[in-house]
């Protein structure tokens, strides 16, 4: 048996075969095994054989070969298959054994095989160390043998050597070259126009050499596709960029990604389109040759913004000046859009394009890549009070409203008590202060309940106390007045909630009844639910039997839970059944049904707290104390400064939830305590009734001070009857009604009530009783300052002229004060009134000092009024009192602090200050 050839002989034989045939593939199995053996940690072939045979053994080379022969006797010999190589030398894989060793070892001698093997192994190892990243990517096995096979592990069991998609070749993707073939010159994409570049494949830039003629053909076909009928019918982006003649700038087309993948040279694009039959080029612009003017989409016309007078908008925090529209054309569609805001039409167009599929428009840039711009809306400021707002001319106001876009309301953070109050506001569906706009309907007048103080002398002197030596009936401080005002708010809310709670209580009772077993007749059942389709399993018929009570045949009906809810909603027209809201008036023994719907906001015990200042007051206290009149001191010519001043009373009001007109007089007593239920069991007739018990400290306060409530139309009828019975100027209740009108109409104007107020005031004035007329002038002065009405202002001027021409100064004083303190400065004043006002430059000019016997020159009367204090008429920059100002005179001790140095129009002070 002859000896096997040595590995060096096999290597030299393989090299000769490869060089002769031009093949660089591996030749035999021995060379492969040698490559595996060289990856060991030994430095030479002797060390490897020493480790295989064991340490300390000294064997010959022939024995080692015979040992290897015995081990490999059963293995088949590899037969090399020579294939022609089609790719160039520069594209050979550097990790391949043949490519790295064939050329350097071809000219070396065949002797000294071990030294050659060692040098070759070291060179391969150095290359692998320098190319760690390449080796790590090539194969899972970590060896170079199976780097690009389907399976790279095992000894020679790979399936192919470097076959497959060339894009998967790591060296090829990165343009890897041998050490001797590397160049230091970087690759310039812009200068090489005969290359096509493909991006974003996960490994880097792919470069494919293409002939210039073929590249021009690609460019021509791509751009002709953009201008084809098929693409233009759906490419609205491209058509929107066209001008009226259908031209597009070449820079726009060259900026598309598919064109950039072919070339970035504009000259090459122009050369490629010279012979085009679809596209023509004129002055670095291109368009479709056939019917080019058919495709452009006209853009929106430029928006013209009228000039804005910014001097009128200094105090308007919400005004944001607009910007004129200017068209913006981008040279690169992929760049972020930075410029003027788009028009509404372009915004809608952009949203449509974003919703389109990317396949519909090949020239459409990536709209999703644009950065989002967050626009934060400014918080809307709180509404400013009318007396503190600066008047703006109507023209500027209209211009301001037209220039601003409507803004949606934002949800702000709320505290628990604010959430509670919002829940209460939801119950006021028929009437609200904020929705009234200082107006009230005639129908709502029937819902007003007047709150007055029952005079103690009525029982002893039904005709009234005309002596003028009465004592103060109610000593109320300013804090208690606020508590009463808050209590009337809460009482009004109870009235509105009472109806809802009663309705829910009735519904719950009916629902509980339906959950019980009730014996009813068939006719009654059909009348109750004529439209509900009942299934057989929802009824349990029983045998006909005679009822003990009426002898009527009955049907025992057991409805289900969901049917009960549906039946309750159908019978009582209720969309929500809330058990927690109905439990307030149910006995404690009645079990509460399972909760079906979410409960409403539970009502908490009400405590005195500051109300919203924008709400109109409900209580008008008297703020003057009686004072002896000094007949020698200068004083105004008014009824309060007479020898027998009037007796003024506190008055308030609440808005009931039900219409209590002349035809409806029944009163619910569900909230009244047992001791107070008797007075309320009847009707709100001419006799006042005490308040029902409600959860607020002011309840006891109202009860202790003798406050009662009465329907407005009945209280008015009682006052008119007393005025007719006692005579003009002799009715104390009529004076209280005058005072109520003066306050109430300022916040809730009603034409019918105002005309009656004006008529009765002048009827009393003709009889030399001027209290009603003075209340009317106070309404004019303070009411117009709060809410200006042109027709009321004209009446104010007429009444003032009439009053001044009759020898009185009170009307002219109120008109002078209105002109001084009102924010409206544009109204036209009657020339006669201007002439009358020339003699009065300050408030002290209205003080006269006539003899007390000749002060009025007419019959004394006791119906006088409390007036507004001089301190409320001072300008904002004044802090001094007019000299010898009269102190307040009334029947109550109620001192209300001044909120601001400006003229105060609060009800606690305005009616009783001058």
From Swiss-Prot:
Modified residues (Phosphothreonine): 329, 427, 454
GO biological process, one term: positive regulation of translation
Domain of life: Eukaryota
Stretches with biased composition (Basic and acidic residues): 28-51, 84-95, 114-130, 624-633
Compositionally biased region (Low complexity): 134-147, 599-608, 665-675
Ranges of compositional bias, category Basic residues: 69-79, 148-164
Entry keyword annotation includes Cell membrane: no
Boundaries of every HTH La-type RNA-binding domain copy: 209-299
Phosphoserine: residues bearing it: 60, 327, 335, 340, 343, 432, 436
Gene Ontology CC annotations of this record: cytoplasmic stress granule; cytosol; nucleus
Gene3D superfamilies given in the database record: Winged helix-like DNA-binding domain superfamily/Winged helix DNA-binding domain
Listed name of the protein: La-related protein 1B
Organism: Homo sapiens
Source lineage: Eukaryota, Metazoa, Chordata, Craniata, Vertebrata
